[in-house]
Regions:
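Conserved short beta-strand edge segments in small beta-sheet-based binding/regulatory domains
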Residues: 34-37, 65-73
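Short amphipathic alpha-helices in soluble, non-transmembrane regions
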Residues: 20-26, 56-64
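Short glycine-/aliphatic-rich beta-strand segments at the starts of folded cytosolic domains
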Residues: 1-12
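Helix N-cap motif at beta-to-alpha junctions
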Residues: 48-52
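A generic structural motif
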Residues: 41-46
């Protein structure tokens, strides 16, 4: 299985509790292996590209009412 890491930059400053909620939202996707943050603006997501895309995962974050972009690695 291939895996891909991506970073999502959230424009808003998000409190730690809200970032934890975002991590949980991303983990609902069966293709997400892990989602974590150690910064109020950044989420690191590891996923299987065979069954989802970075765009789909970005849309999941944006659907939570946040302005977010992908950061290239």
């Amino acid at each position: 299985m291939d895996i891909v890491d991506m970073i999502v930059h959230v424009n808003e400053t998000v409190p730690a509790e809200r970032m934890n909620e975002l991590e949980e939202v991303l983990r609902t996707d069966a293709c997400v292996i892990s989602a974590c943050s150690s910064n109020p603006h950044l989420l690191m997501v590891t996923y299987n590209p065979a069954c989802t895309t970075s765009g789909n995962l970005l849309n999941m974050v944006q659907a939570q009412g946040l302005h977010a972009n992908l950061v290239g690695l």
